[in-house]
Amino acid sequence: MSKGLLISIEGPDGAGKTSVLKVLLPRLREVYPAQVITTREPGGVAIAEQIREVILDIDNTAMDAKTELLLYIAARRQHLVEKVLPELENGNMVIMDRFIDSSVAYQGAGRGLDQDEVAWLNNYATDGHKPDLTLLFDVDSETGLARIAANGEREVNRLDLEKLDMHQRVRQGYLDLAEAEPERIKRIDASQTLEEVVEDTWEIIKSYL
């Protein structure tokens, strides 16, 4: 697919994936022969960041599930062609904070949209590109939401306002994806201490370098 290495990090809200990435980045940059680029979805480039603001705005409570999905898909396409693919072509490692699996878990399992249709839209938007490795940071929904509530630095967004059962469906959607694609998606127990999660993650990534 490309000269570089594409890694996505996924998980339900409050799993701590961003904290793990911050700790691991210095290690990765020491051992990877090219640049290590981090980016996020939705966002990463100007157009996609503008779409992100619309999606996450807490005032947009009237947003329909399909509208939400299509906004994510539009942001994904722009981000991929403008930033991700050029970096991969240059031989760099790209680490994406969320990618295609988020749509299946959140809009598919969480919102109840047809998961085959979500997968088709993902494929259409990405021309079939998938991560070489997906790290799934898994934590039960109650723990994840408690972490969000305790994090005073994190700005609350529209998705944080969803009820517990929505978050539980999202988590199950992720677990189903991991079961369906075990070679690509590696589950990490994110209920452990940060140090333990970091080491588990590092062992997985090392096998792909």
Swiss-Prot record:
PANTHER family: THYMIDYLATE KINASE, UMP-CMP KINASE 2, MITOCHONDRIAL. It holds the Pfam family Thymidylate_kin. GO terms for biological process: dTDP biosynthetic process; dTTP biosynthetic process; dUDP biosynthetic process. Belongs to the thymidylate kinase family. CDD domains: TMPK. GO terms for cellular component: cytosol. InterPro entries: P-loop_NTPase, Thymidylate_kin-like_dom, Thymidylate_kin_CS, Thymidylate_kinase. Keywords: ATP-binding, Kinase, Nucleotide biosynthesis, Nucleotide-binding, Transferase. Phosphorylation of dTMP to form dTDP in both de novo and salvage pathways of dTTP synthesis. The lineage of its organism: Bacteria, Bacillati, Bacillota, Bacilli, Lactobacillales. It is an enzyme of class 2 (transferase). It comes from Streptococcus thermophilus (strain ATCC BAA-250 / LMG 18311). This is Thymidylate kinase. GO terms for molecular function: ATP binding; dTMP kinase activity. It catalyses: dTMP + ATP = dTDP + ADP. It comes from the Bacteria. SUPFAM superfamilies: P-loop containing nucleoside triphosphate hydrolases. Its EC number is 2.7.4.9. ATP binds at G11, P12, D13, G14, A15, G16, K17, T18.
